[in-house]
Design a protein with these regions (language model features):
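N-terminal targeting/export leaders
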Residues: 21-302
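Bacterial N-terminal signal peptides
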Residues: 10-18
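Bacterial N-terminal signal peptides that target proteins for export
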Residues: 1-9
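Hydrophobic alpha-helical segments
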Residues: 8-11, 48
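Detector for methionine-enriched segments
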Residues: 1-2, 16, 32, 287
Length: 302
């Protein structure tokens, strides 16, 4: 009996040592990154996320990924990434920061895009990833403020005044800047939206709050003011009719990746304002900050 017990213990120890050796030799210590994220949206049109460890001044890819409809980390083919663990062929323990970027479809190079989404400095091999990190957007947008009016300056008629949304301030009697937003880093743009009967319709993308945005897809023939906004007069999307009445809808400012993976609003929406059901034209209405649900994450080098 003693001999049998000794043999059994020896065999068990041998199996444990073999398993330990297999785990160690499979991925050496310091070459794995465990990611956990919340609030990310699935990217469309082949766009995807990619992790980077910043070693010195060199970005080292820790792997490409997307998230599913439940926010779980998945491969580019949709398979689950067990434990959010990515294996690399580099020792990551000398990294100073972890950065998550948004990469375009077909990306094969070894460099990150300018669209840095989440990031965080590493300390003791771990990092908290936020939008506000200096390596990401560099601002948490909690100080953002906004105002808007309903008006249709691009038409001569006065019967459609509630069919235009402009991010400006008329409280002084003269048009003034209605948005207070930080300057975005490369790879990002702001975009205005009017939610009409539950449908988000873009007013255009912009980077300056005191200049016209980049398009007037739905506006009338006259010139608009030098501020972001749109009149909804022509070329209504399917299911909508222009001119319309924006009262009872919502005005939104989003932050969009550039280039963008989708024509729909992105997750980052720092400002929103309900348009009263009894809204009057040429009256200034406020927007409120909406940053509590911004994505977050953590990264641990193993």
């Amino acid at each position: 009996m003693m001999r049998l017990r000794t043999c059994t213990v020896a065999a068990t120890l041998a199996l444990m040592l073999a398993a330990a050796c297999t785990e160690t030799t499979g991925t050496p210590e310091g070459q794995m990154l465990a990611l956990s994220v919340s609030g990310l949206q699935p990217l469309a049109s082949g766009f995807h996320y990619e992790g980077w460890a910043i070693i010195g001044t060199t970005p080292v890819s820790t792997g490409k990924f997307n998230v599913d409809a439940q926010g779980n980390i998945v491969t580019l083919t949709g398979a689950p990434v067990a434990g959010g663990i990515f294996r690399t062929d580099r020792d990551l323990r000398g990294a100073s920061a972890i950065v998550i970027t948004i990469e375009p479809a077909g990306d094969v190079d070894a460099l990150p895009t300018a669209t840095h989404y989440l990031a965080g400095a590493l300390g003791s091999g771990a990092a908290t990833l936020t939008v506000g990190a200096s390596q990401a957007l560099g601002n948490d947008f909690t100080a953002a403020t906004g105002k808007f009016v309903l008006a249709t300056p691009t038409t001569a008629t006065t019967t459609d005044e509630k069919s235009g949304l402009w991010f400006l301030d008329l409280s002084s009697g003269s048009p003034a800047t209605g948005l207070s937003l930080p300057t975005l880093p490369a790879g990002w743009k702001y975009e205005g939206w009017a939610v009409i009967n539950g449908v988000p319709v873009s007013t255009g993308t912009f980077t300056a709050v005191n200049a016209a945005d980049d398009r007037k897809l739905f506006s009338g023939p006259l010139a608009g003011p030098p501020f972001p906004g749109e009149d909804f007069i022509v070329a209504a999307p399917t299911g909508l009719t222009f001119p319309t009445n924006l009262a009872g809808g919502t005005a939104v400012i989003s932050i969009e990746p550039s280039p963008d993976d989708s024509p729909l609003p992105f997750t980052l929406k720092p400002l929103a304002g309900a348009i009263p059901a009894t809204a009057a034209d040429h009256v200034t209405y406020p927007m409120t900050t909406q940053t509590s649900g911004f994505p977050r994450g953590s990264a641990v080098i193993r």
